[in-house]
């Protein structure tokens, strides 16, 4: 799921960059085509019988959302997994939304360099997700989350260290960028940030599903999406405030990298298996 999600995001952002400056009606047509494609694709999803067919739908969105979140908090493992997943989206939102400006200012690159960095980030997440699943061998191993958080922290700090002294005025192409010796450590670190993001998120998604009962699982996923959205909006607000006050993407990336530390402490306090206790086999 992680792999597919970020590959889709990668293609979407590359396509968005490619169509910048084209007439608005072309953008509108592309959006409609993507929407139609998603709708058609959903028709091929296998049908699954409802596990809680008697669930009443609350038509008041605000009241229904509050009720769902209140119910989710009572399930400690589910809520803990949701907070961890939402932090992953918080980090991802900060990196990807600020990456175009970061590429211009600190790497001196144009849109093609941005697309390269975004591709490396997405490839890293896909590779990390696949390897984490392979290493887990069909078991839930929450210790990989701690490994991922450690990697995100270290690589985030290294990225800031590698680029904080760079400040470019003009924009250069991808061949110029690849001719710079300092570019390769930056590319490697960006890939590793995505890689450890995959290790961080995959066990949490597994835990979310295995910790939920069959009758509550769909509602747990819904609650997860709501909290994910709240965290991503919070990421946008934090980014706007810090950039307004300090005008420094490096500072923003530094704070996000260090933010993995209190998040890890929170997760470990709520579940000791994040320190490497015995794994449990996934439910079929």
Where do the language-model regions lie?
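Alpha-helical transmembrane-bundle signature of multi-pass membrane transport and export proteins
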Residues: 1-276, 280-283
């Amino acid at each position: 799921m992680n792999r597919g999600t970020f590959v889709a995001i990668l293609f979407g952002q590359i396509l968005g960059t490619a169509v910048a400056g084209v007439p608005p009606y072309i953008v509108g047509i592309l959006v409609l085509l993507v929407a139609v494609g998603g709708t058609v694709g959903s028709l091929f999803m296998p049908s699954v019988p409802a596990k809680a067919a008697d669930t009443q739908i609350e038509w008041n969105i605000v009241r229904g959302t509050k009720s769902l979140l209140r119910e989710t908090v009572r399930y400690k493992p589910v809520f803990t997994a949701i907070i961890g997943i939402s932090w992953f989206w918080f980090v991802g939102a900060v990196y990807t939304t600020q990456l175009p400006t970061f590429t211009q200012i600190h790497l001196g690159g144009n849109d093609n360099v941005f697309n390269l960095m975004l591709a490396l980030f997405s490839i890293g997440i896909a590779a990390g997700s696949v390897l984490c699943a392979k290493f887990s061998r069909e078991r839930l191993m929450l210790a990989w989350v701690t490994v991922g958080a450690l990697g995100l922290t270290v690589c985030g700090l290294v990225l800031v260290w590698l680029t904080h002294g760079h400040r470019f005025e003009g924009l250069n192409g991808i061949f110029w960028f690849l001719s710079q010796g300092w570019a390769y450590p930056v590319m490697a670190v960006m890939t590793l940030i995505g890689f450890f993001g995959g290790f961080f998120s995959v066990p949490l998604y597994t835990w979310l599903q295995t910790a939920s009962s069959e009758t509550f699982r769909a509602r747990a996923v819904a609650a997860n999406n709501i909290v994910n959205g709240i965290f991503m909006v919070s990421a946008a607000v934090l980014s706007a405030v810090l950039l307004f006050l300090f005008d420094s993407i490096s500072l923003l990336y530094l704070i996000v990298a260090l933010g993995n530390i209190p998040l890890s402490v929170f997760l470990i306090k709520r579940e000791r298996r994040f320190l490497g206790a015995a794994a449990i086999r996934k439910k079929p």
